[in-house]
């Protein structure tokens, strides 16, 4: 029995000792700080570096470094390494490389390459100088300054009064950052879900009547416009011309793709070739960008790593040059515009195929198939409207660089095209209003419901109230003034942040006073995005002033939390809108989203009232004001002739529908209620 007890205690003691050892081992710190971006901080240096890597490991208390360079002098050298964190010097190491057996620099020889790899031991006292927060905080604000001096100069005076032979500066990275591919994927998914949800409900609304399409579009939010403006706001916060905390630039870079800042090695090589053939200066100090660990050359005029300023800092974080930003934006804008147009064309071809094969009714979606070019025009112009702030901003910013004439010419042509489109649009609408007699102030709603206007220009004011359609010009003025300040005042951070805040305040006040957007949910999204812009640029004002780096980081984190919460809310709302759209469209699921059910019930009720008593006044019908105000009727004065289920004008102008019985529209008796369109006696507004 005693032997059994002794054996039991022996086994138990071994288990406890092994567990204790594992616990002690797991509690040992295993932190790491390593260099990321680097650049030379001295021009015309006798010793130049092509590579500088350094990593500090807390477990073995050592710094491992790797240096590649070239020497043009003979000298005995002394290394000086300074570690800075959050604006303060935390550690300094001055030593003779011969003491740690760095033979290639002991001494350095003229016209020889330097290849040095070494391990520098660190004392526990030096480790205590580095704050513990450095090991876990995202986007650690740290720098390493590496200099080489002549040993004779240091012996004759002091190291601070000596002239270095070489100088490098590199940022420190602890492996934690707000720059994350998951956030990029989530932002792209949220934008795609918002588009898919709106388009899905748009088609569902056409299954019942074109009368419902505008109401459905406004109630299925957030839309492309809402989500696009929010993503642009977050991305632009990283492009303000202030010395920004690294954490804010890293966060903004997740959304830089909405600005067209998407690049890879092949695109960069093509852009460099384009700039080279248009007298581009590759060593211009305005180019921006610094080198990472896989770089093989260093530009002495690049921005100092760790100091992120305006578009240069955002370009560095994205991995491109500032002179390439406009060209990247233009390339991806044209690609996205082609994708939007291709989706519309493919959809029209699918509808035609389904009609030819009689899978759907012969007259289903007649408006889309007959007037596909108007649908295509509305879709493309809606995307141009979303991209307008980005395009104007990058055009004006390209003018400030003046580094190569090729991108400047492209920017000038695009600016002329955009403003030509704006002027043509204004002249066209004014001419239609004048010639059609729609300028009567007693009945401004006819502008909204006139087929000569909204079938072409509905993308401008689709979500605006009838009496507030001119608010779209206030939006253009807002975008243009924002672009001017953001692009032209990059070198005056304090003035820029204050002006941007004033612009957003004025825009928000106009929005609150006029309340131009129709529908509660639509207005809520607009107000939420506008308020986010105001708060974002308000928080950037103190960062523009001479605050210490730690208060700047705290303000930046508060801004990230606010923007992150708003983005998460809008993304979840887009997901819910998409899910409810799928549930409504799926035949096996007998579910209809409540607001759509109310719209359909109201439409059916008004159909019944109009069928029993066509002379009943519209004011006696049940109001749908809680969902969206009714559109006013517009009856074309000319006589019409019936062609199937479509009313066309007898004078041969078949590009305009007559809106007889436009509100509500009676379903055609020969077409089932589940078809895409019930006869199209009413002209729909297209996106």
From Swiss-Prot:
Primary residence: membrane
Keyword Oxidoreductase belongs to the record: no
Sequence intervals crossing the membrane: 186-206, 331-351, 376-396, 407-427, 469-489, 498-518, 524-544, 553-573
Compositionally biased tracts (Basic and acidic residues): 638-651
Subcellular location(s) of the protein: Membrane
Membrane topology: Multi-pass membrane protein
Gene Ontology terms: cellular component: cell division site; membrane; plasma membrane
Record's keyword terms, sorted: Membrane, Signal, Transmembrane, Transmembrane helix, Transport
Region (Disordered): 632-653
InterPro entries, sorted: TRP_C, TRP_Flc/Pkd2-like, TRP_N
Span of the signal peptide: 1-21
Gene Ontology biological process terms from the UniProt entry: fungal-type cell wall biogenesis; transmembrane transport
Superkingdom, taxonomy of origin: Eukaryota
A molecular function (GO) term: transmembrane transporter activity
Family: Belongs to the transient receptor potential (TRP) ion channel family.
Official protein name in the record: Uncharacterized membrane protein C663.14c
């Amino acid at each position: 029995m005693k032997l059994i007890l002794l054996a039991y205690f022996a086994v138990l003691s071994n288990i406890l000792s092994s567990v204790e050892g594992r616990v002690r081992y797991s509690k040992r710190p295993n932190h790491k700080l390593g260099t990321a971006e680097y650049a030379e901080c001295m021009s015309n240096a006798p010793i130049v570096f092509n590579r500088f890597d350094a990593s500090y490991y807390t477990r073995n208390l050592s710094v491992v470094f790797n240096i590649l360079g070239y020497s043009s002098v003979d000298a005995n050298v002394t290394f000086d390494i300074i570690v800075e964190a959050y604006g303060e010097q935390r550690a300094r190491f001055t030593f003779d490389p011969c003491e740690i057996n760095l033979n290639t620099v002991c001494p350095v020889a003229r016209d020889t390459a330097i290849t040095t790899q070494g391990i520098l031991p660190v004392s526990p006292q030096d480790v205590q100088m580095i704050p513990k927060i450095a090991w876990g905080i995202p986007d650690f604000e740290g720098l390493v300054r590496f200099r080489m001096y002549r040993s004779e100069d240091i012996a004759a005076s002091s190291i601070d009064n000596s002239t270095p032979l070489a100088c490098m500066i590199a940022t420190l990275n602890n492996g934690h950052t707000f720059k994350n591919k998951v956030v990029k994927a989530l932002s792209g998914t949220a934008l795609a879900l918002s588009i898919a949800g709106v388009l899905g409900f748009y088609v569902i609304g056409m299954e019942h009547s074109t009368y419902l399409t505008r109401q459905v579009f406004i109630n299925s939010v957030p839309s492309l416009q809402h989500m696009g403006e929010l993503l642009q706001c977050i991305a632009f916060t990283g492009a303000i011309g202030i010395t920004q905390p690294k954490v804010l630039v890293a966060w903004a870079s997740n959304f830089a793709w909405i600005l067209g800042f998407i690049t890879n090695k092949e695109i960069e090589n093509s852009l460099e070739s384009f700039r080279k053939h248009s007298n581009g200066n590759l060593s211009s100090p305005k180019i921006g960008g610094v080198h990472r660990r896989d770089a093989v050359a260093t530009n002495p005029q690049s921005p100092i790593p760790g100091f992120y300023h305006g578009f240069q800092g955002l370009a560095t974080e994205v991995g491109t040059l500032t002179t390439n930003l406009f060209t990247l934006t233009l390339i991806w804008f044209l690609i996205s515009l082609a994708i939007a147009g291709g989706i519309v064309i493919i959809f029209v071809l699918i509808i035609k195929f389904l009609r030819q094969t009689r899978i759907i009714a012969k007259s289903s979606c007649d408006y889309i198939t007959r007037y596909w070019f108007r649908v295509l025009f509305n879709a493309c112009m809606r995307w141009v409207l979303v991209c307008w702030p980005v395009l104007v901003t990058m055009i004006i910013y390209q003018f400030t660089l003046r580094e190569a004439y090729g991108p400047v010419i492209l920017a000038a042509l695009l600016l002329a095209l955009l403003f030509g489109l704006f002027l043509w649009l204004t002249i066209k609408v004014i001419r239609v209003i004048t010639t059609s007699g729609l300028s009567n102030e007693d009945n401004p709603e006819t502008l909204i419901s006139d087929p000569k206007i909204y079938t072409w220009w509905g993308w401008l004011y689709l979500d605006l109230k009838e009496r507030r359609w001119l608010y779209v010009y206030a939006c253009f003025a807002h975008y243009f003034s924002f672009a001017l300040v953001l692009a032209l005042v990059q070198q005056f951070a304090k003035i820029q942040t204050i002006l941007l805040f004033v612009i957003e305040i004025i825009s928000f006040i106009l929005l609150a006073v006029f309340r131009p957007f129709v529908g509660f949910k639509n207005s809520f999204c607009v107000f939420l995005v506008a308020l986010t812009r105001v708060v974002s640029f308000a928080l950037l004002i103190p960062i523009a002033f001479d605050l210490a780096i730690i208060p700047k980081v705290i303000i930046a984190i508060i801004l990230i939390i606010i923007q992150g919460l708003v983005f998460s809310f809008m993304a979840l709302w887009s997901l819910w809108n998409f899910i409810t759209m799928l549930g409504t469209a799926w035949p096996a699921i007998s579910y209809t989203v409540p607001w759509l059910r109310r719209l359909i019930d109201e439409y059916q009720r008004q159909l019944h009232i109009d069928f029993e008593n066509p002379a009943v006044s519209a004011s006696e019908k049940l109001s749908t004001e809680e969902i969206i105000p009714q559109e006013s009727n517009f009856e074309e004065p000319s006589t019409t002739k019936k062609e199937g289920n479509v009313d066309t004008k007898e004078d041969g102008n078949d590009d305009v529908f007559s809106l007889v019985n436009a509100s509500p529209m009676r379903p055609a008796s020969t077409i089932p209620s589940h078809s895409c369109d019930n006869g199209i006696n009413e002209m729909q507004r297209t996106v």
